[in-house]
Amino acid sequence: QAPAQLFQFGLAAEDEAREVSRRARADGLHRAAAMVPKGEWGDRVLKAFRQDWEANGGTLIGVEHVDQPVALAQQIADLFKLRQSEGRAKSLQSTVGTDIAAQPSRRQDIEFIFLAVTPQQAQQIKPTLNFQYAGDVPVYATSHVFSASGDKNQYNDMNGIMFCETPWLLNTTDPLRNQVATQWPQANGSLGRLYAMGVDAYRLAPRLGQLKALPDTRIDGLSGNLGMSPSQRIERQMPWAKFVSGQVERLPDTPR
């Protein structure tokens, strides 16, 4: 039991995992695969996604823990059962005794991929998905894929990936953001998420009593749309964007 005056607010990756679950449900999807880094952080994010996804009727039908780049092609082939398809083609070729031009076919029951990796890992994963006949599978990612560097070559490699992100980094015309970035240019990059959290913490302080007394209250902040859980933790819902031809395009917000 937390002390009555203890409130928690942070940029939790678990919030983003639940945001992906919420968005995919809103888009009418039911069967997911996941790709997360090896290690404790990846395990935590996967657990948060899995719990929310399965609690709301979704199915998680495959998981790969990303580590070494050289293993990536094999991991994606395993996830989509491509080697089984190649084996069937070879078996048929052996049976009929003639060469058969057969393109490997992937499993069709994965409706989307939940992705929580670094920009560098995402740069390798998306082209590998394309190469492994899975380029048409939607990819829903946490903000960790977005470096906010403006590097169009990096963004091109991730073409088609959808990701949740703070309003601070997506609303580039926000007056307060621009005022802050004039003084501290790093606020335009990935560190901007921390500036957004700082602004929101300042604005939240006088409204904590209201959020506690009225649990359905939401506040539009610069780190996300904010509400309070029964355990007095501030939870974020976030807007969405997509990498399109080297640009970041804002997507319509998820219905609440």
Where in this protein do the model-derived segments appear?
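Extracellular/periplasmic periplasmic-binding protein-like sensory domains
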Residues: 3-6, 80-92, 108-110, 126-199, ...
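Segments of small-molecule ligand-sensing domains
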Residues: 182-250
